[in-house]
Amino acid sequence: MLAGMSLHHTRSLAPLTLALLCGLCELPHAAAQPAPRAAAAPNTPADDRMDWWREARFGMFIHWGLYAIPAGEWNGKPVGGVGEWILNSAQIKVADYEPLAAQFNPVDFNAEQWAKAAADAGMKYVVITSKHHDGFCLFDSTHTTWDVADATPFKRDILKELAPAVRAQGMQMCWYHSIMDWHHPDYLPRRSWDPRPELKPDFDRFNAYLESQVTELLTNYGPIGVMWFDGEWENTWTNPRGKRLYDLCRSIQPSVIVNNRVGKGRQGMQGMTADGDHPGDFGTPEQEIPSTGIPGVDWESCMTMNDTWGFKKDDLNWKSTTTLVRNLVDCASKGGNYLLNVGPDARGRIPDASLDRLREI
């Protein structure tokens, strides 16, 4: 058993997944049969906390923020890499990135429509970027003005609108939250093209800011299913800090599930937790699915519909619906979850190509 992962017994498949397994059994190259499971054991409190997630199998990932405005282009030139990394990929200084906030006015955002699209596809939970690596917050935070309520003409708290819409569809609301923060004056390390030494950064102050925002997210928006952390790989973030953050989450909402990116145990993009004393309740393979089942280990593969997470207007490399359904079956048959991403545009619209595939699923 890998450290940081909960031992569990045979999980029941959600009705949607059972239907998919039956419907795809004749497809060529269909997913392998479930791997042998660990022996059944009495439920523990940890198992009870994880039960809904283990039965869910299928969730929606939403990457949305200021990066949807440039949409993969800067100063008239296309920028390589995924859309949400444009500040880093194009080596944009914070002072040049900040004006995007004044342009962010997603008048077509409709929380109910987003939630319905997820529910109609059979998804059981929604994970949205409360804050990505650019530090911009989609919620009204009292600890910064670098957020949608203070820095944009939109002025509305995205999370405050999305959470009740998601719950009204019978799904769990979950937050993605980046530890790495290219914007914050106290975050370290700095980007080489924008060192800003005059700010005299102090990572302990940044850590206090991070914990304060996590407290807001787990206090002001009702019950949260998962805290999905990311950006933990830089050397200023340590395993003791991760344990403290994990404990903070559980102290505010004891039933919340926390992924393994809260600490330092994740082993690259394959996402599973290394041996050792690492915090986190499940592994997070990224853009891949484990080749076999992993008895006794909870995991979730997060994957894109095209080649980017955040909206990128020229990325038209869409996976077929058949491929997406096979991925879902592959994950479910091996005992894992499938977290499928959509990247809304700057007006708040989920791309038609994504909506088409969700309907077809």
Annotate each predicted stretch with a short phrase:
Residues 8-9, 29, 33:
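Low-complexity, intrinsically disordered or signal/transmembrane-proximal segments
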Residues 4-5, 25, 29, 59:
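A composition/secondary-structure signal for short, hydrophobic, low-basic-content segments
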Residues 14-26:
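Bacterial N-terminal signal peptides
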Residues 1-2, 310:
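Accessible peptide chain termini
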Residues 31-361:
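Mature catalytic domains of secreted/periplasmic carbohydrate-active enzymes
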Residues 2-17:
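Bacterial N-terminal signal peptides that target proteins for export
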